[in-house]
Amino acid sequence: MKRREFVKDLLLAGGSLAIAPRLDLTAAIPPPPTDIKRVLVTFMCHLDVGFTNTQAAVIAKYFDEYYPAAMKVATTMRQSGEDRYVWSTASWLLYGYLEHLTGAARNRAEQAVVKGDLAWLAVPFNLETEMLDRSMLEGAIGISQALDRRFDRMTTGAKMSDVPGHTRGVVAPFAANGVKLLDIGVNGASTVPEVPPVFVWKEPKGNSLIMMYHHGYGSVIQVPGSDLAIAVEVRNDNAGPHSLSEVAKIYADLRKQFPNAKVSAANFSEVALAVEPFKDNFPVVTEEIGDTWIYGVASDPVKVARYREVMRLRKEWVEKGIFNVGDSTDIRLLQHLLLAPEHTWGVDTKRLKDYEHYTPKALATVVNAPRFRWAESSWAEKRKDIDDAVQSLPETLRSEAEARLRALRPVVPDRAGLRAHAAGSEIETSHFTMAIDPQTGAIHRLRAKATGREWASPHHPLGLFAYQTLSQKDYADYRAAYIIAKTWWAPMDFGKPDIEKFGAKSQVWLPRVAGCWAGKLHDGFRTLIELEITDVEAERADRVAWPRRVYLDLRFPDSEPAVRIALTCLDKAANRLPEAMWLSFVPAAPEPRGWTLDKADQPISPFDVVKGGNRHMHAVTNGVFYKDAQGSFSIETLDAPAVALGERSPIYYSNDQPDLTKGLHFSLFNNAWGTNYIQWFGDDMRFRFVLRA
């Protein structure tokens, strides 16, 4: 995320980046007419629900200062001439602002909406959309639709910024709910997906969106085959509305750039209406794009697991008709729950101003210092959003949600009814012949009795736990592959400065079996493996913080050919050095193109991703699926959505296709991101998976 004080080598907010894109993507678009006659200009600022301050402080800033300032600028412009100022904001933010106001203040804001001075986007704010299922995406648009009903509008334009890419799974739910156009502004340092500036994004069932892509938060785009240009003017992160002088300069610059054009202010729905007649001139993209920032979501496993549990429960309630998408109960819930996949996870970590206290012991000496407490409070604030979502529910639903969340708490697994078992010896269950690797505890034999197919072997482990640390070279390689702007802030946001001084190494540790127990249950079979990692040198050097106790709990129900996995990790110390934890699956699946990913409830091939998108890590909704002529295999993940394909690293970036023969690696936790993601984590964790074969 760029900040005005950081972006010294970028153009002013609203302009394109002061760098050339890696690839000229305009060749496939018909050249625009030289005589542009209409310019629509949109005004907004980039919303981070956090980052520049805590979430509560940022919201207060918009409510107390920015909305009144925007209305004042709009009123002054209206009174002084023909030019207008229309401030477009997130639907979630404007909805909350109107609910916050009372009396004359609310009336003034409502009149500003009626006059068109304040406008909202179809999306609630900037989302990491791979974290939402389809029902949640529809609910997110429901906030805009609630405002539409209130003010007799039809919002069809959406914009998101910062996050470089999104999943194709958004196309169908957005289109089904009236969204016509989605404008994307890419973070200043991040690789831009190799898509045209204007295109139609089409999904397999024929639904489509008009897309506009900027190398920066906004820029001026000439619409192919038309006399129309769109200027997207975006002030920097939480910087508020434009000043009168800024607005005057924007109008003057656009009139100089397009001397024969009428320049007028617009909201994004008016942009969608103006652009749509030229849709047939635009190239069509059918591939997935993906989110190259998605590795950050694994920085808080507790928040993510609790969010996903409530998301699933919400979907169950909607499917049962207990409430409807976008109704009052849903809106109250989503006002809080949607903040979990919002792209801001805390305050700006650069404001710690500390590149000395990285190791577990060193971190412990400063974690109670004011700046460190401030950072931790911002992460806790984000977790509380889920509690607030649950508290917004009617009593019976609230009780159900609270019970589901309590069930997530990690505990030492009960060994009642189990006996000591020699790891490595075969176990017969109703549906499988199974064996555990006596060294690592992973499944190294899984024969499906119904088909005779062997899905696991010593070279094809299933459920292999691993702990990883990263080096400065790992980050240098990552930035060389991914960062496209030489800014002084990028190495801090996309790296860990000076970690080489504290012994940071690129290394992976596998566990060893410390105990194994097995036994028949009334409804199936259960195997419990206790794992441990030991490395005296690494521990003495104070550069690792793996969990002291790890349990892999395998249950084989009689009712279906499935393996229910629960991985419990206890007693992990907080560590600011970059680290990651994984659960890997390398099934005997010889046809790489047999894999599909479930993203926002849409199947997507891992080989159908644009260059510059994310080809090596995805967040999945339900899981991953494999099918060939001989059978099928699936991995359902309940708590850990981010999965790396082939390469087991949170910061591997490449335009090469993934090598799925190397397996699929679920990111249980990593603190590889800087920016505003969680930088250290010392909580207990529990992760659930279901294998079906």
Stretches found by the model and what they are:
Residues 19, 194, 286, 310, ...:
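Intrinsically disordered, low-complexity regions enriched in Ser/Pro/Gly/Gln/His and often acidic
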Residues 17-19, 26-27, 421, 465, ...:
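Residue-level detector of intrinsically disordered, flexible termini
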Residues 327, 331, 339-569, 683-685:
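Catalytic and substrate-binding regions of extracellular carbohydrate-active enzymes
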Residues 22-23, 152, 460, 621:
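Ubiquitous "structural anchor" signal
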Residues 12-14, 29-386, 521-693:
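Catalytic-domain carbohydrate-binding cleft regions of carbohydrate-active enzymes
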Residues 5-26:
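N-terminal export signals
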